[in-house]
């Protein structure tokens, strides 16, 4: 036995000897220690703040193999000065004042294994911060020279017995963590020691061996132990907050160099040092970076023989490895990480101890490495702080407030009363907010940030104590703002104690409704420690009865909580990066996720079902959005029955469910893709739902084959809205530049060739993805726009806009907003029904109903027997999300029906006058990152964006008569409002790079602040005369003695050193040094402005870094890189340098006391002009006389008389705006515009004018034009007639004609002969049209297109004369013109010509005759001609706007392009033998003398609550607006047109218009082709004189070739030549609201052949017959079996069992319960309760009388029928019983 022990001892001694080759027995090694940690904005200035450290380190090996150490003579020096050579600067000792560092000088021991330091043993009374500094020093000796912990890598090489050269990676423990470390070991030439003796000061002791260099580089990205604290980096992409690199704004690197002498078996560590550098872009936007550099250098001073054994430790404590140890807030004593881990996992205790014992006696390095790797996980797992308790402040490690006071929390300082300090800060902030300007000089927002930090240190009782004080002060009126400041700060704390207190405040009604909602929203956004206990308590709060009873609070609670759930439990990456997981462990726990699946989602599901059963639309919308916020795949189980028609909800709610699955697409793209693609694939689904599914599908990054299938299907899909969405999103995805979208971009590019060639407008379904990438800036902007226009309106019913940026690798959600509505028209209808005007018009119509003629709309509806097509009830939402703050506004028809009462209540409040005071402090963004530096000192980076919004004042408003009267909305005649208020907004972006020295509780800091302050006083009175269309706003100027800052912006870089416990703003601390650049490098400005023009004096002053950037630079970058290039050019000139800009109001130099703004608007239809002959362009003197009138109405009258002169049947519009400043002197400015335009008369005039009454200067831009109408139905006439347009323009300004500058111009626009020849000889549509014309069809699509093409004006000839222009302006214009020459070189030709005259410029513009894709521009001035040729116009929008047309003006062309209308407006044509619908569908038509409905306006309306369904006849008879157009064939080539309409403009009367062919075959402008009678009275008109009715509401006039055009304002116009008729829609009114030969005018051309019984036929003959008023009755009463109703949606399975994680179940008995139906007498009757139905064959049936609910055969009825046929089970339990029906019911199944 004893021999065995002896053998073991010998083996152990030999192992100890071989495992410590750097340390010789009985020898003491003395090293000098030098360390420094400095922080500064090194790329801005050489100013630094930091600390130097010096000491001696004594090391010697013990007999037991441990390395014993001791530190002596420790001292430190504080640095706050300029260092010309940066952090490396050498400072003489004479210039440094060192202080003794109270660092433990007691011995410590290092446990070695094969030369590696495994554990540190210190005296038990060692302080934690001391232990960490010791670790930082001894970490320099952590050298794995043999690759003991090497990571497997085929490229690695290891030392041999003879040579130490090697390259390999290890996982190494040092003070900064357990990180991957790259070793590069190689020999150095020995001669280097001669020139660099410091690298090996004891080189003489080298003995045998080499000079060896060891280079180590740490890879923090790959680490197993990351001592750190981080918060707010949830949106960081592909990175870890403690990694080597985070985005493009954070760099962390650590490099070590050691010099050894000797050989592998015995060597001496001569010197070693490590440089740890952290570089941060302070506010993520500047190009300059700040840094913290930490360096530790250990150099061998001497080697001494040791005469005695090292002394033993009196009270040893093994504190584990060298990794930084977290401190305890209440106790700064060092503690063992061993004990912590044993407590966490006691089962590993025995195995760990056995493993350590076994390791001491291993002999082979290779076998040791192998066995170590094969063993169980290491005992020293990453340390964690105990999970925060709800009632206690969390023990956040590394933060200055937690470790800054000698390693303890600053709360432990008896002189630091946290409650009192918080109260003091709140009071200071409150006092400063009262006087807004003080917030600048007092740095109020800095104080608020400090306040938030202190509140996070408070326990529950601390917060409760201060809250009671603040609340009582507010109640007693002592302090107005203290409560709101503290309330907001507690919400920002985001801790458990904050949550518990906020919960109590709500329960005790300290905060309620909107105030409570804002607090909850902030709390959820700022949560820092979402433990399971915290999340459950938050859920309890969100589901409390008291919360649920307050609608706003309930909504915010639910939405905020579900957002937080997603962040913590669903998005794993965000959860890891957002919260301090390296300090407290992961919050993404299994229990937490189970809680979401088993409690949260089921609760929301239950609430959704309850809301659906109660028809509570607002709650339904909120619950859908809340489920979408969570984004877990389990929400599919909730939505599945509604998607697939098993349960009944409105189609709008189904749409919203799809729209709210955005986060599901982000987190579970594979599952989401399957669901969205199935929804998209279902062509019987509603188009808007499919469009939203396409948008969500793109979010899920679809694979290339899926996009290709979708692209190919656009050539087949019948729903053009969906095709438009697919095409737009694929085409925009092809243009994405960001690398993040590379996969999507490639997939889209491969799918693009497969897309349909059809062009769609932006006003159709449109999904646009766009990004702007500025690589140098590290900035990307991503924009998503989605819109979907319904069939009833060009205005989108779905709109969505998202903007987020990737800033140096940080994704930041800036804005997400949008809205959805079930029906735009229903919204307008519901609002209109609330008005008194509606009641009056309805009454007026009721009185006229009895006078309707036989062809009235209602009578025709009776004969047609239309089947009513109802809409769903109105539903709508508007939502917005800024950062993490989400708000949803929901309304429906019932909400709007309460609008009059809501307005009445508000009117009552504002009539009495309302005081308002809103003060809100908020952190828009917060980030914090802390970890130990190489010196063992905690580094901290913080980024804060606090803002203050303050709005205070009083408002009083009065409407006469009241807007809400008798529960109806009325149009007031007068409105007056008085408001006196001040709006103040202050914001700060603040960034600190700091570190803490716990031994003297100092914090060293480099910072950068960017401040913005805006304060606007408002003292105004508004008086509006609605009836006269006049408004006046008076602004009173405050009489004050001191200057008032309105805008103030500063950028301030600085360095600082201060006490950790200081609670004053950094800028106000004594040792803060603002970094100011040299004055010569800055541009200073100081000027006054405004007094000359307004009598108000403003001063602007400040300074900024000199920038050298010119216009040419920006143009160059725009050409090369577009917007991103300009950004980069501007950004390159930005910096973190000190700058300032201020705008102030100077009352002492201002004479104005009141400013008055007046606006007058007037519009009228003028049959005959006051002056028959057109007046010439005004001279300046004539203009002056017309503007001399003081009264706006008089000025308007004079101007209208002028612009309307000589123009028949003109619509005159005029606006006059004046601005007066009254005081010691009166300043007055007048600006206005007027326009006169006629539909028939070619003359028109536009005028803009301005007058400065003080300087007696006036000016005007007047344009007179002559634009004749063109022919509309005959291509030959259009080609034979030369279309042309003339413009005459004059711009002038000055005192009088003698000194005023003047620019005159004339332009003539025409169609070139080349254009005409191209159309005739080369355009393929010309020959198609001519063939159709031979068949007497003149206006089918080909001819329509050609007729429009024939009138484009591709040639422009112009001349410009100018005089008395300012020479500087002339030089500028000449410079710009020369720039254009250079820009378009070599497509420029310059030649000399004979002079065109002085001050004259003339030339031509010729567009390419074929397709206008190129343009030639000729400019002649003086004696030179410049030709720009073949200038590209590939942009379709540009071509649309630039190439003029005499009929379709620019606005009309733009609208047509946006709507995808090839001919700019939708048209319907009844030609000789063929007709065309509004959807461009053509078919054969054969009319007879029987009147046939071409177009009848039959709007869809939702049923009004409480009313029974009415027939179409009843609805149209009561409708205040009706239109019907009938046509009959009276002869072989002759048709007659009958139009009946009523409108409020007709006073409810039905107006009958008849258009008959003229008996005279020779038609012309003076001899029109038709005879028109209105209500039996013949109309007289020609091409310049209009015949009108109802004050211009109906207008009739002739076109140049005699065609007759009839216009109905804001509805349609009709062109008729006796043989054919073309109806053109001019607004949204007719969309999806017509029946007749023109089709349905919906976005679905496949339903154009809908007959009055509301089914679709394929037989065009029967389609035409069904709309014959008399003959069609028999066919309408017995529709063909081939006539099929359009029923959408048809449901299908979109969620598979795997997607939804659920299985469908059936009844065990073989039966299922289903609703049934029967069809009788045009009704469909549904069973109110489901009946048993056999899955297999029926064995026995019984006959029963079953209660049923019957519905007329409407779309709704067929929808339910289709739903049941597909296996759905709609809920009829709440429907009334119509009758009973006998049915056979299954009693038993086989």
Swiss-Prot record:
GO CC annotation terms, alphabetical: extracellular region
Gene3D superfamilies, alphabetized: Lipovitellin, beta-sheet shell regions, chain A (2.30.230.10), Lipovitellin-phosvitin complex, chain A, domain 4 (2.20.80.10), Vitellinogen, superhelical (1.25.10.20)
Annotated disulfide bonds: 1468-1638
Start and end residues of each stretch annotated as Disordered: 342-400
Keyword check for Ribonucleoprotein: no
Signal sequence, renumbered to the chain: 1-19
Biased composition (Acidic residues): 342-353
Domain VWFD: 1466-1675
Sugar-bearing residue positions: 219, 297, 554, 573, 893, 1345, 1416, 1430, 1480, 1699, 1735
Entry keywords, A to Z: Disulfide bond, Glycoprotein, Secreted, Signal, Storage protein
Positions with biased composition (Low complexity): 378-389
PROSITE patterns recorded: VITELLOGENIN (PS51211), VWFD (PS51233)
GO MF terms, alphabetically ordered: lipid transporter activity; nutrient reservoir activity
Localization: Secreted
Source organism, top-level taxon: Eukaryota
Record's protein name: Vitellogenin
Originating species: Anthonomus grandis (Mexican cotton boll weevil)
Species classification: Eukaryota, Metazoa, Ecdysozoa, Arthropoda, Hexapoda
